[in-house]
Curated annotation (Swiss-Prot):
Role, per record: Expression of just the minimal mamAB gene cluster (amb0961 to amb0978), including this gene, is sufficient to form a minimal magnetosome chain with small magnetite particles.
Main subcellular location: membrane
Transmembrane as UniProt keyword: yes
The protein, known as: Putative transporter MamV
Gene Ontology terms: cellular component: plasma membrane
Organism lineage: Bacteria, Pseudomonadati, Pseudomonadota, Alphaproteobacteria, Rhodospirillales
């Protein structure tokens, strides 16, 4: 999947397939860890299975948001449904934080009450399988997210990386508990909770950034600026900004050009710039370009050059003064 960006239809197929695979993988891991955690007596593995069940539910919502964001724009939503993926990512982040807080409370209270037990040795294999599966899913989803620019899939990738790290913490706790440190299993579960809490906060904050029209990455903006400087050195960039709209971006560009450029030339330049920017940045699907005259040209066009023009200007001033209401005069009289 590495290389040049895929075509939009291919991107959507790959993105949808990744969302389905992620959801059912979460369900399979949840069932597997629950069964093995109960049979082996590992509290950390049982706590981790609850997190996986929560993953399954949130990823179902994630899949629905990915499907909804593919709907074409209409009169009600002229820019499309892309931002629904930020809502989905926000829900995933909040759900992760809520589940982590519950898991943290559960293990702290059990550890404080002294209700600890040593897990069986086969719990080690469950933690290993969980860590390996989560890491593979993370790499696959991250690859898909980088090509499709999907915030929902990127959130799912980060979630799986958190699962991989937390599974390693569970593995360490199980091994230490078997070797004689009985409380290690619960301490590992507490560490898992704190890690998942942090991942959820990062996902939630990034989604809020997108919902509040956060800027596209600064290096992408710099790339567009360099593109203009390289191919159109006679055009000055007055303002260049971009915002995230789910998988796509909106780029707002204000350029300063000579007042001698005709309207037809402006239209031709606009089409050329839109095409060039779209080729370099495939996710820039909404490009708005405005032109203003260069400062020196603007000053020249504002100068009144002939006596006839001066007389006409004075006549307009007198006419406007005659039509002005008395209450609006400068001295109030």
């Amino acid at each position: 999947m590495l290389g040049r960006p895929m075509k939009p239809s291919k991107c959507q197929e790959c993105r949808d397939r990744a969302a389905w695979l992620d959801m059912f993988t979460a369900l399979a891991l949840a069932v597997f860890k629950t069964a093995l955690g109960v049979l082996s007596g590992s509290m950390a593995l049982q706590a981790h299975s609850l997190h996986s069940f929560g993953d399954f539910l949130t990823k179902g919502i994630n899949l629905a948001s990915v499907k909804l964001s593919s709907r074409p724009a209409n009169s009600a939503f002229p820019y499309g449904y892309g931002k629904v993926q930020f809502l989905s990512a926000n829900f995933i982040g909040i759900s992760l934080m809520a589940g982590a807080a519950a898991m943290l409370w559960y293990n702290v209270t059990h550890l404080g009450s002294g209700h600890v037990q040593v897990p069986e040795v086969w719990a080690v294999f469950g933690a290993l399988i969980s860590a390996g599966t989560a890491e593979l899913m993370h790499r696959y989803l991250r690859c898909v997210a980088e090509h499709t620019n999907s915030p929902a899939i990127m959130a799912a990738a980060a979630d799986n990386r958190g699962d991989a790290y937390s599974s390693l913490a569970v593995l360490a706790g199980i091994v230490l508990s078997i070797l004689g440190w009985v409380a290690a299993d619960h301490l590992a579960a507490i560490l898992v909770s704190l890690l998942v809490l942090r991942i959820g906060a990062v996902i939630a904050w990034d989604s809020i950034h997108g919902l509040m029209d956060g800027s596209v990455p600064s290096h992408r903006i710099d790339g567009i600026r360099q593109l203009l400087a390289a191919h159109h050195p006679g055009v000055s960039v007055v303002d260049l900004r971009g915002r995230r709209m789910g998988e796509t971006w909106e780029v707002d560009l204000q350029l300063s050009i000579s007042s001698q450029v005709t309207v037809e030339e402006c239209h031709a330049l606009t089409r050329e710039l839109e095409s060039r920017i779209a080729r370099e940045e495939p996710h820039a699907c909404h490009i708005r370009i405005r032109f203003i005259p260069q400062s020196g040209d603007a000053t020249k066009t504002a100068v009144i050059e002939t006596a006839a023009a001066v007389d006409e200007f004075a006549y307009l001033v007198e006419a406007s003064a005659a039509l002005r209401p008395l209450g609006h005069s400068r001295n109030g009289g």
